[in-house]
Amino acid sequence: EDNLSDLEGKEEAGDWDGDDNVLTVAAFAILFILSFLYSTFVTVVKVQQ
């Protein structure tokens, strides 16, 4: 419980300038783009069939 509260405290502090946060945002952006491209690809394949 102590570890969880420490993590929550760090999240609440919101160190947006940290490298970890930049990597996290970049990772989510890449995942979002990949999922969007994948869904578009699947839709195109279904239409062609």
UniProtKB/Swiss-Prot annotation:
One of its GO terms (cellular component) is immunoglobulin complex. The chain crosses the membrane at residues 25-45. Glycans are attached at residue 3. Its main location: membrane. Keywords: Adaptive immunity, Glycoprotein, Immunity, Immunoglobulin, Membrane, Transmembrane, Transmembrane helix. It comes from the Eukaryota. GO terms for biological process: adaptive immune response. It is found in: Membrane. Expressed in the spleen. May also be expressed in other lymphoid tissues. It is a multi-pass membrane protein. This is IgW transmembrane form Tm2T7/Tm7T7/Tm3T3. It comes from Heterodontus francisci.
